[in-house]
Amino acid sequence: MTLNWLRRDNELKDHALLGEEYFGTEAPSVIYERRPITDPQGNTVAGLFASWIILNNPTQYNSYTTEMVKAVIAGFQRASSDRAVVAVVFTAVGDKAFCTGGNTAEYSAYYSKRPNEYGEYMDLFNAMVDGILNCKKPVICRVNGMRVGGGQEIGMATDLTITSDLAIFGQAGPKHGSAPDGGSTDFLPWMLNMEDAMYNCVSCEPWSAYKMRAKNLVTKVVPVLKKDGEWVRNPLVRTDAYVDDGELVYGEAVAADQVKAAKELMAQCTTDFSKLDAAVNELVWKFTNLFPHCLIKSIDGIRGKKKFFWDQFKLANRHWLAVNMNHEAYLGFNAFDAKKVTGKDVIDFVKYRQLVAEGALFDDKLAEQVLAKPKA
C-alpha cells in the first residue's frame, strides 16, 4: 500500500527574505558570490556552493557603512536559506584589512549627537551579528588583513577563523570614545581566559595573528608573503621561539632594532593569498563531507554559549551606545575622523580627566579644550 492519497506539494519554496538589491560591486558595498565547491584535486562539484560575503570598502579599511550593514544582513539570510550552499566565507577586498569596524566618517559627521539615529543604526548592527550567529551554514572568517574594533566583533561572531599572518586583532573603543559592546565584551571571555580578555578588551593594543593562534582565538594562521617562490612568515613577528629568557615571545613583535630589516624583507616580497584560500577551501571541503543537519546542530550547540551573554546584554548595550553618542563618542570619533586636519587621532586624555575632576560641563567649550586644533 502506498501513501499517494496524501496531499503533497513538491514545488520548492524560496525562503530568501531579501533580494539582491543590497549587494553591489562598487565601493563602498558588499559583494555576494556563490562559488562552486571544489574537491582537493580542483574538480568542481555540481550543484553545491560556498557563499562568499565580501566587505568592499578598501580605501577605508573595509569599515562598514550603514548600507553595508544592511547588505551583510541580507547576505547571511540569503546564504542561510540557500539549500545548495555548504558554507559561508566572510571576508573582504584587498590585503590590508578584513574590517576595522564602523565607518568613523558616518559616526562623527552624522551619528554623533544624534543618539536616536545611532540607536536605530545599532538595531541594524545587532541584526548583523544575529544574522551571523543564526546562519544555518557554518561560517568561516577569512581574515585578509587587520580585524579590529567592530571588525573583530563580527569576526568573532563567525564559527572559525583562518587568517593571513599579516593580520592584527584587537579593540579600539576605550581609546576612541566607545566600549566594544557590539560583541567583544560578550565573546572575548569565552574565547580567551578572563585575564587576557580583559587586557585585550581595554588596552587597545593590537595582537598578531600568531599570538591569537597561541591564545586559541583563531583556528589557523598561514603566510601570505612570497620571495623567490618561497613562503616567508611575517618578519615583524616572533615565530622562531616560544620562550626567550623566560618570557613568552611567540607571536610578539620583533625587537625594535630588527624592525627596519623586517620591513626591507617585506618590501622584497609579493603578497599571495593562494595558501589562505587553499586553507579555506580545505575547511569547506571538510564540511561538505559531513552530514549537513548533524553539522549545523553541532555548530548551533556551540554557538549557544557565545549567544548566551550576547543575548543577555545586546539590548542594554544598544541603549548605552546610543546615549554615548552625546558623550565620549562625540569626542572620540570626531578626533579620529579629523586626524588629517589636526595630525592627531585622539583627544588630550589628561586634560579631559582634569576637566572631569573639576566637574566641568560636557559642552562645546569642553570639547574645544580636549580636541586637537587644526594644523596651521
Predicted regions and their residues:
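An acidic, glycine-rich surface segment that forms the CoA-thioester-binding/catalytic face
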Residues: R7, V69-I73, Q77-S80, T104-N144, ...
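C-terminal alpha-helix plus adjacent terminal tail
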Residues: M1-F49, D95, S208-Y210, L225-A376
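Hydrophobic alpha-helical segments typical of transmembrane helices
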Residues: L124-M128, S184-F187, D196, K297, ...
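Crotonase-fold acyl-CoA enzyme core
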Residues: G131-P292
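A structural preference for short, pocket-lining loop segments at secondary-structure junctions
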Residues: A46-N56, K70-K113, D130-C141, L160, ...
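Glycine-centered loop/turn positions within well-structured domains
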Residues: T59, D95-K96, D186, M198
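Glycine- (often His-adjacent) and acidic-residue-rich active-site loop
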Residues: R7, K13, L17-Y22, A92-M128, ...
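Short amphipathic alpha-helices within nucleic acid-binding modules
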Residues: Y61-Y64
